[in-house]
């Protein structure tokens, strides 16, 4: 189904703008499932009312982030990007640094955009020097979701905003059990996720990092003592303490983790804001009680987490730049942002709207995400053009440590050398 959808969208992008006369419609492309697309269509109503003679065509792509990225890069190469398109943080280097996205700064005053309204940490993701290549729409930090019922049964207090690795490990060990007495563990304290997009946040919270400042080399940072210790500790969830089930199919790790969590077989899992909508439905059905806490940090190390962001951008070679910028500005204002936040899609990038969403949320989830975001920073994917290749090497590193039994110190030294070569630090 996804392949057919991608092919269909690819054909649309390939044909868009290829006629003798430009289409009178303003085209919008974003990555969303049907529910989010329906909301986005409602958010277009005020814009359409103010521009009665202008038709707006919305296309949503229910694709994974890598699939959506390929779609954008193909459209960029063919010069067929639509008038406004969703720009994820990890696509900023490819679309902005290579000239695919328009610098919006010269158009902002005419569109009535006040950049002070946005969360400045999130806004910086779309900046390159004085240029701005996207208006931020929403963002989210990585968090830990926990099953309140499992903690209550074990008489374990819920984690605080300042909990540490030691507290996390103690709780996870207490929550790892053989519930049916058959000699095999069937309830785990934590979920081990092999994806670097998830575990890098844990390395940061341990005082380490996978790349050095500037993102041009790994040696001196990936192989630093703090990073090695953090990788050893994170991998130890499965290799030493057995507080997490061993990963099997890496391509389905997120789906399997979510299934085990909702079945009450995992107490803690690392999630982004995309988990909120699914968990809301589970909680509403009465089968699950959930809380959220920040990524725990190593004692003596400041809290840290990853921020992921989305925005709307306009193609540099677009024929309707003015209309595109106006539409992007409209869709990233406080009211649309608050609507997405209220629907559980993401935290609003407009700071005031984020506060309003958190205050209105009776579960306390949004407030927890907002507090954790105060310790967040953008991931390397928003800054390093070769991140996909770097990410693949890091995933292989974690597999060698957890599945292959490699010594973390030796494994990271080899990976650091390979990343230096990949990033051009060595020849």
Predicted regions and their residues:
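Glycine-centered hinge/linker elements that transmit conformational signals in sensory
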Residues: 171-172, 216-249, 295
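Conserved C-terminal helix/tail region of periplasmic/extracytoplasmic solute-binding proteins
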Residues: 152, 355, 371-427
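Conserved N-terminal structural module of periplasmic/extracytoplasmic solute-binding proteins
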Residues: 4, 15-94, 111-116, 250, ...
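Extracytoplasmic/periplasmic solute-binding protein
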Residues: 129-137, 142, 167-220, 226, ...
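C-terminal lobe and pocket-closing loops
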Residues: 275-285, 298-396
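Short helix-initiation/N-cap motifs at beta->coil->alpha
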Residues: 60-71, 90, 163-170, 246-262
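Short, solvent-exposed loop/beta-turn-alpha elements that line the ligand-binding surface or hinge
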Residues: 105-118, 161, 180-190, 208-230, ...
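Hinge/lid segment of periplasmic solute-binding proteins
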Residues: 89-141, 293
